[in-house]
């Protein structure tokens, strides 16, 4: 029995030695050969110094007050009775009989191109490229046509005149050169009353006086 153990022991030792050498060989194959570590050195970059000359502070500029340009004084335009009329094959309905006794109305505008537009009296016409003149019986017809020119064709230079039988011409719209819906400095309000409706006087106090509550200067 002892002889058997003695004979086996060297085999086991030899086997362990061969196993350890094989494992080391595998480790070397897996991890690679040993590499000697090198010392890392850090070199600081040379410092840069930028020299800048101090700029002299500019003296504060004097504030120049911008004055609003004074509006140009409005001059009443003159009516050119020889301006061409729009092209249409029908009639505007003619002028009323009062045109021979009282007045008729004219509207002028500058067309951008020959474009078809609707007449306030019915039907359609072709406005000319350039100056146009149309005679109508009522001021309301001119205002309606002016609204169409402004909204649909973006024409804002239309003007309305009243022409009397004597040949006298009265400029009506826009009265001061600016349309009523726009603010015009210096415009005087017409028919305005700086008070609320609740501050109007009692109608009983104005009875038989020929005054209206909104026109009276009486206070509550």
Swiss-Prot record:
Transmembrane segments: none annotated. Residues 209-220 have a biased composition (Basic and acidic residues). It is found in: Plastid, Cyanelle thylakoid membrane. It holds the Pfam family PsaD. It is a peripheral membrane protein. InterPro entries: PsaD (IPR003685), PsaD_sf (IPR036579). GO terms for cellular component: cyanelle thylakoid membrane; photosystem I reaction center. Belongs to the PsaD family. This is Photosystem I reaction center subunit II, cyanelle. It comes from Cyanophora paradoxa.
